[in-house]
């Protein structure tokens, strides 16, 4: 795990190198994805089935076998262990409760001329959600993508989830049932994204695609953007943990919080920032100790070797500068006064405040969404939310008096822009 010191002359260059990561712009990858999209547009269901057999080793002989019925979703939910079912239901309730507070409403007002102006908020008609699949899959991703869409009032939710060798975690199906997903197809990769974006005989064409996936999924989402909306181009998972080395800091807690992201992927990023050199050394030691019996130690070791870092800063102010420069997906402020510190944090996907708020709680059941901007995009992006599944139309309703007054202004400006038909259209309203 590399060590960076903000007081060293090389710090800026080292930090830039640490944050440099891009997989979606690989020319070979993009060419492969473009070819898959073209095949799906041309061949529809038949091509999607063929590619699913090829890439996922799925045993399906017909496309119909790739769709999971509502009956099977209900069976998966009803068959859950009671403890797991209760946990899933609690998570769903909390996610729903949080996102209900995000719902935007239509509004209007009347100006002095009697014109009615406003904004009409409507849900999207159809959305596609991509859920990573296989036996080691993520029911939490189902809840985090589907429930905000449900709260927004989306008409139809179509879920795609890869099932390598035809195997799928029943908990994912149970989560789909609980979240009210309308259709589920066991397909994945760029072919699933293409099918959602352009539609096939069986898969409805959607208006927007959300959810994380591998580099092929990310590249495909970028490629179809414009044909459909997308939530974001998701990169590898990230966490930045900040602590200051006071008596209450538990180095083993901090180390495990870092590893909770490192175990996701060999290119996940775990960064620890502190002004305390003794704490930095303790955390480094605790990481090594924790790796001894961590089931996914090989993945975590590779992640911290590839993209992990321990960063020593001069003080809190400098720590905040580093945080805002990195704009992490997940930020933990493990300090006594996180309320004071958070005011200066401008860029982070989700902020976990205090020592008793591990990122893992946010992944599952705190309530806020765990689909977050990565790769520094928290500088201009937000977590997935209800607002991603709603759109706005401007409302303009002129009174006769208001139209005559505003038409004069429109006429003048249209003439200056040399748009004569615009000017005449406005002029016709003036008595």
Model-derived features with residue positions:
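Short acidic-hydrophobic, aromatic-tinged amphipathic segments that line or gate anion-handling sites
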Residues: 2-9, 183-188, 310-315
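C-terminal core of ALDH-fold dehydrogenases
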Residues: 325-431
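N-terminal Rossmann-like NAD(P)+-binding subdomain of aldehyde/semialdehyde dehydrogenases
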Residues: 1-125
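Short loop-to-beta-strand entry elements in the cores of soluble alpha/beta enzymes
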Residues: 212, 232-243, 261-284, 300-311, ...
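Flexible, glycine/charged-enriched surface loops at secondary-structure junctions
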Residues: 104-109, 229, 268-273, 293-304, ...
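Conserved NAD(P)+-binding/catalytic subdomain of aldehyde/semialdehyde dehydrogenases
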Residues: 180-269
């Amino acid at each position: 795990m590399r060590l960076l010191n903000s007081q060293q002359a090389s710090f800026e260059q080292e930090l830039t190198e640490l944050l440099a990561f891009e997989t979606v712009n690989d020319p070979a990858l993009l060419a492969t994805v473009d070819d898959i999209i073209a095949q799906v547009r041309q061949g529809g269901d038949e091509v999607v089935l063929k590619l699913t057999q090829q890439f996922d080793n799925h045993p399906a002989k017909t496309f119909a076998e790739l769709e999971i019925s509502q009956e099977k979703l209900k069976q998966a939910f009803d068959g859950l262990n009671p403890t797991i079912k209760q946990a899933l239901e609690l998570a769903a309730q909390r996610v729903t409760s949080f996102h209900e507070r995000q719902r935007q409403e239509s509004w209007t007002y009347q100006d002095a001329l009697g014109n009615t102006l406003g904004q009409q908020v409507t849900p999207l008609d159809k959305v596609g959600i991509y859920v990573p699949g296989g036996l080691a899959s993520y029911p939490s991703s189902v809840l985090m993508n589907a429930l905000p869409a449900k709260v927004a009032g989306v008409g139809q939710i179509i879920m795609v989830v890869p099932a390598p060798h035809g195997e799928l975690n029943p908990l994912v199906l149970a989560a789909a049932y609980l979240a009210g997903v309308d259709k589920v197809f066991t397909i994945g990769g760029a072919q699933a994204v293409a099918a959602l974006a352009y539609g096939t005989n069986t898969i409805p064409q959607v208006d927007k695609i959300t959810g994380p996936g591998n580099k092929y999924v990310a590249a495909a989402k970028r490629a179809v953007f414009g044909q459909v909306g997308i939530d974001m181009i998701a990169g590898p998972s990230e966490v930045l943990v900040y602590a200051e080395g006071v008596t209450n800091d538990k180095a083993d807690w901090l180390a495990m919080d870092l590893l909770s992201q490192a175990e996701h992927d060999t290119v996940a990023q775990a960064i620890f920032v502190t002004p305390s050199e003794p704490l930095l050394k303790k955390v480094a030691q605790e990481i090594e100790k924790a790796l001894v019996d961590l089931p996914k130690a090989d993945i975590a070791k590779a992640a911290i070797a590839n993209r992990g870092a321990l960063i020593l800063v001069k003080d809190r102010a400098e720590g905040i500068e580093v945080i805002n420069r990195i704009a992490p997906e997940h930020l933990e402020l493990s300090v006594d006064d996180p309320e004071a510190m958070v005011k200066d944090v401008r860029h982070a996907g989700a902020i976990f405040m205090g020592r008793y708020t591990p990122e893992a709680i946010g992944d599952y059941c705190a309530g806020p969404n765990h689909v977050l901007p990565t790769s520094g995009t928290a500088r201009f992006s937000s977590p997935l939310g209800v607002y991603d599944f709603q759109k706005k139309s401007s409302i303009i309703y002129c009174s006769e008096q208001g139209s005559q007054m505003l038409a004069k202004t429109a006429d003048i400006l249209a003439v200056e822009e040399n748009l004569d038909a615009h000017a005449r259209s406005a002029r016709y309203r003036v008595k």
